């Protein structure tokens, strides 16, 4: 796939990189702005992050931005952080929560009806550029291995051999009146596994996967399975009764018994998990739950800096030159060819209104993300 170096290019005006494309959101379905297959772009972006290649990461993220594929972009960001960074620098979870809130603020200041126009917003470009730089620089850990559930594991007669909890009190802390009673023994085991007493990371992951498999079997039999509504889940109300929130209820309640920073980390992970949540997306985001378990079960050193101090200057330099990426992408736009007639003209009334509404100032020249 095509990629080149951008940050040696000097860009003087935002107009040089302003995207004026005739295509609507529907025309980008399955493709990036430059007509690469979206699946391939996501793969290239993830590989760029894995191999710490900042410039390609900025390019491929911009391809998704210019096509309005923000959900896909955030999914790649969450996947990379939760699977490849996790305890290497878990503080990045708090940082990402901050940036998601910044992203929502920008959208709510005039872009709710047309997310494609976000591609020309300078703060959006710098926001994702900064995220790419920080993820590329992040300290890594070995990726989590998926825990497999065997068919025999669903046998209710033999599964009891895996039970370790000494009492039923662990599950009683989280189970509510309308929660499915048949799940209680397994919820109790999961809750015990993440306590300081039980402290069994492998079994905690096992019980999560067991609950997932049980839910899948119920759906296959067309049996509805829901829990009592958990209002702490900031998702669509129809999704607040998904079984997954029992698991997060366990994590949140256990974190309340730990230090303030662990509580803050857990709340941040919960917030990341809820981003554009739909029933079934927990499979894509289960590494966030694996990370939550690791935080509760492992001794780890919490990094206070989101990025190495020596790299902070480089990040700011790249942010200031990010428009050079969009200059390259602009070459692939589909337009009338008459944009030169409007070069230098003032923005539309809507754009001017957005600028007045936009009071956020999170991207200073010398900004260094730090807890």
Q: Positions of the model-derived regions?
A:
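Conserved helicase/translocase motor-coupling segment
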Residues: 44-47, 53, 61-63
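Generic helix N-cap/helix-start motif at coil->alpha-helix transitions
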Residues: 36-40
């Amino acid at each position: 796939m095509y990629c080149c170096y951008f940050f040696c290019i000097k860009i003087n005006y935002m107009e040089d990189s302003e995207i004026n494309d005739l295509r609507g959101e529907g025309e980008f379905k399955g493709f990036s702005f430059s007509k690469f297959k979206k699946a391939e772009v996501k793969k290239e972006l993830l590989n760029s992050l894995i191999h710490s290649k900042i410039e390609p990461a900025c390019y491929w993220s911009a391809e998704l931005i210019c096509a309005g594929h923000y959900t896909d972009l955030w999914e790649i960001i969450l996947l990379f952080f939760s699977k490849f960074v996790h305890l290497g620098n878990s503080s990045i979870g708090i940082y990402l929560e901050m940036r998601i809130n910044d992203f929502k603020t920008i959208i709510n200041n005039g872009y709710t009806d047309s997310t494609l126009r976000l591609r020309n917003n300078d703060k959006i470009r710098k926001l994702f550029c900064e995220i790419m730089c920080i993820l590329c620089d992040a300290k890594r850990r070995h990726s989590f291995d998926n825990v497999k559930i065997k068919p025999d594991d669903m046998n209710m007669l033999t599964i009891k051999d895996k039970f370790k909890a000494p009492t039923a009190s662990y599950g009683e802390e989280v189970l509510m009146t309308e929660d499915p009673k048949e799940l209680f023994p397994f919820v109790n085991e999961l809750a015990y596994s993440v306590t300081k007493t039980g402290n069994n990371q492998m079994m905690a992951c096992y019980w999560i996967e067991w609950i997932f498999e049980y839910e899948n079997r119920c759906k296959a039999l067309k049996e509805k399975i829901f829990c009592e509504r958990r209002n702490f889940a900031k998702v669509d109300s129809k999704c607040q009764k998904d079984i997954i929130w029992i698991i997060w209820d366990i994590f949140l309640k256990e974190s309340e018994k730990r230090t303030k920073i662990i509580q803050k980390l857990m709340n941040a992970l919960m917030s990341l998990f809820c981003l554009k949540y739909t029933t079934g997306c927990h499979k894509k985001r289960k590494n966030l739950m694996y990370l939550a378990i690791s935080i509760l079960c492992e001794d780890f050193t919490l990094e206070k800096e989101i990025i190495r101090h020596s790299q902070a200057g480089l990040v700011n330099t790249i942010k200031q030159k990010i428009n050079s990426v969009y200059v390259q992408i602009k070459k692939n736009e589909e337009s009338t060819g008459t944009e030169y007639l409007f070069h230098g003209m003032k923005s539309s009334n809507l754009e001017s209104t957005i600028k007045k509404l936009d009071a956020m100032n999170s991207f200073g020249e010398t900004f260094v993300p730090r807890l």
